[in-house]
């Protein structure tokens, strides 16, 4: 999925970001987060501005939900922006200029700008412009609650603490298995329960790692024309 983020530069360039097209609301397994999922979906479908901040210590689907929100609106022809602040070395704070004109702005990993005066001020100014226009949906993620971000700009910390704040609860092992089986089903193949539990036992349980491994196994299964079994998985992953 291509999402175009407008850059307010002298050349009026745009920064195209390719987001995973398999990270949608349909492929997100909510676990104990149905309220957060419902809040984001409601915000996306509203015609007026709103603000949601959600956080988790270990990732656990934060980026997935932002990608899903972008996909939902971009498919309707709406202008959206996604800014991964863990990759801010590739762009400048001015990337935020003018984003209040977009239907949706997603800011990922805001903890990464803590202590960076220019980025903090740019984010503070964007927040204020979005509030003034009242049209843009703003979704922000972090690895901790807003008040614990160690930001150098107190007013930004205060702004981020307004609105709806959620903790993204981590999935249990049983929920991770169901999330893997959902992803497999959407890709058109079956992940047997014993194979899924084997993966959870032998691999890093971080969901991004598990999904990447599932993709690898899917490709290997297609190439070898074999179903997913524990012996086949051991062979492919050298376990």
Swiss-Prot record:
Gene3D superfamilies in the cross-refs: 1.10.8.60, P-loop containing nucleotide triphosphate hydrolases
Keywords: DNA replication, DNA replication inhibitor
Top-rank taxon: Bacteria
Annotated InterPro entries: Chromosome_initiator_DnaA-like (IPR020591), DnaA_dom (IPR013317), Hda (IPR017788), Hda_Enterobact (IPR022864), Hda_lid (IPR055199), P-loop_NTPase (IPR027417)
A Pfam family assignment: Hda_lid
Gene Ontology biological process terms from the UniProt entry: DNA replication initiation; negative regulation of DNA-templated DNA replication initiation
Task of the protein: Mediates the interaction of DNA replication initiator protein DnaA with DNA polymerase subunit beta sliding clamp (dnaN). Stimulates hydrolysis of ATP-DnaA to ADP-DnaA, rendering DnaA inactive for reinitiation, a process called regulatory inhibition of DnaA or RIDA.
Matches recorded under HAMAP family: Hda
Family: Belongs to the DnaA family. HdA subfamily.
Quaternary structure and partners: The active form seems to be an ADP-bound monomer. Forms the RIDA complex (regulatory inactivation of DnaA) of ATP-DnaA, ADP-Hda and the DNA-loaded beta sliding clamp (dnaN).
Protein name in UniProt: DnaA regulatory inactivator Hda
């Amino acid at each position: 999925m291509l999402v175009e983020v407008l850059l307010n530069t002298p050349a009026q360039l745009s920064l195209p970001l390719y987001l995973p097209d398999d990270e949608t609301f349909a492929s997100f397994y909510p676990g104990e987060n149905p309220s957060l999922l419902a809040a984001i979906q409601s915000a996306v479908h509203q015609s007026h501005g709103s603000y949601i901040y959600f956080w988790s210590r270990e990732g656990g689907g934060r980026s997935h939900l932002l990608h899903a929100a972008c996909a939902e609106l971009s498919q309707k022809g709406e202008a959206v922006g996604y800014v991964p602040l863990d990759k801010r070395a590739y762009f400048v704070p001015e990337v935020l200029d003018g984003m209040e004109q977009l239907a949706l702005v997603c800011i990922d990993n805001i903890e990464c700008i803590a202590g960076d005066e220019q980025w903090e001020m740019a984010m503070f100014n964007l927040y204020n412009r979005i509030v003034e226009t009242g049209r843009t949906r703003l979704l922000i993620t972090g690895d901790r609650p807003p008040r614990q971000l160690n930001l150098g700009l107190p007013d930004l910390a205060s702004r981020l603490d307004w609105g709806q704040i959620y903790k993204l609860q981590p999935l249990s092992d049983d929920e991770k298995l169901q999330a893997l089986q959902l992803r497999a089903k959407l890709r058109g193949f079956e992940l047997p329960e014993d194979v899924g539990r084997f993966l959870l036992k032998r691999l890093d349980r971080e969901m991004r790692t598990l999904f990447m491994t599932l993709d690898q196994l899917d490709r290997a299964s297609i190439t070898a024309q074999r179903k997913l079994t524990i012996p086949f998985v051991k062979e492919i992953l050298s376990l």
